[in-house]
């Protein structure tokens, strides 16, 4: 159905229809409200949904206000109110972003403990990935003891090859006893080394440090890579209690920083 013209009220057919300002117009009826100049979609200006030309388009006028003392006082008061409101909003939202925490000794100790725990977990994951999931963790100390035993035995054979006759090697054992007293008469390299290392302990397990560790608390001990830990007692999965043989200090130590010997 064809709409009616917004100006003359007659039917507007598609050939002469102008759709503008949410209304339908005849091309001849789409003219300026003031001068009746015919307009098009390029040169019209709308005001209150009525078409105007550029010359008669209603312009908004501003009333000039004199700078009287009263107006100046009101202006200054408005600026002060705006500044006060800005400061009020600033102070209100000041603590919502983030708060600065004082760097107390207690917080420093907690931070250092967290760093130590993260370092322990990192080394634990590294050891698991290095030993593999096939149960190689239990065989690692024994393999190292075998290597150590073979390295101890090789210098003896190089230093005194002329003291070991081929006919009776057992009778030459008393001559080798002062040099390697803890070897005994066993020919397996792993067993004499374990006897040599466990003899001075006098009770408890013995462990060897595989990393350097600095004590993070008063009840912990510090040690270096290669130190021997004696009288070791298991506290839980992550911590042990023992004595550093080199320094004589006794306290807690991380379990994944040492290995059994």
Swiss-Prot record:
The modification N6-acetyllysine is found at residue 42. Residues 121-130 have a biased composition (Basic and acidic residues). The modification N-acetylmethionine is found at residue 1. Pfam families: LIM, Nebulin, SH3_9. It comes from the Eukaryota. GO terms for biological process: monoatomic ion transport. The keyword Oxidoreductase does not apply. The modification Phosphothreonine is found at residues 68, 104. Residues 111-186 are annotated as: Disordered. Residues 5-56 form the LIM zinc-binding domain. Keywords: Acetylation, Actin-binding, Cytoplasm, Cytoskeleton, Ion transport, LIM domain, Metal-binding, Methylation, Phosphoprotein, Repeat, SH3 domain, Transport, Zinc. Residues 167-183 have a biased composition (Low complexity). One of its GO terms (molecular function) is monoatomic ion transmembrane transporter activity. This is LIM and SH3 domain protein 1. It comes from Homo sapiens.
């Amino acid at each position: 159905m064809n709409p009616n013209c917004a100006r003359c009220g007659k039917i507007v057919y598609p050939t002469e229809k102008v759709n503008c300002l949410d209304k339908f117009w005849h091309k001849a009826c789409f003219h300026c409200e003031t001068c009746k100049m015919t307009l098009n979609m390029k040169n019209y200006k709308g005001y209150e949904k009525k078409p105007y030309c550029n010359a008669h388009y209603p312009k908004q006028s501003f009333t000039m206000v004199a700078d009287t003392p009263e107006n100046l006082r009101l202006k200054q008061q408005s600026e002060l109110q705006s500044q006060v409101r800005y400061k009020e909003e600033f102070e209100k939202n000041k603590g919502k972003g983030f708060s600065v925490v004082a760097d107390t000794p207690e917080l420093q100790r907690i931070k250092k403990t967290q760093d130590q725990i993260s370092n322990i977990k990192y080394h634990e994951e590294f050891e698991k990935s290095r030993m593999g999931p096939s149960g190689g963790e239990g065989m690692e100390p024994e393999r190292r003891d075998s290597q150590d035993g073979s390295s101890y035995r090789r210098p003896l054979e190089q230093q005194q090859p002329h003291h070991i006759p081929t006919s009776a090697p057992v009778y030459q054992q008393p001559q080798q006893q002062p040099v390697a007293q803890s070897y005994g008469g066993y020919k397996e390299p792993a067993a004499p080394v374990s006897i040599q290392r466990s003899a001075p302990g006098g009770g408890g397990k013995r462990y060897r440090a595989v990393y350097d560790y600095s004590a993070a608390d008063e009840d912990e001990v510090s040690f270096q890579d290669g130190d021997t830990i004696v009288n070791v007692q298991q506290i839980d999965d992550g911590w042990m209690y023992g004595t550093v043989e080199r320094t004589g200090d006794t306290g807690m130590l991380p379990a994944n920083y040492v290995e059994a010997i």
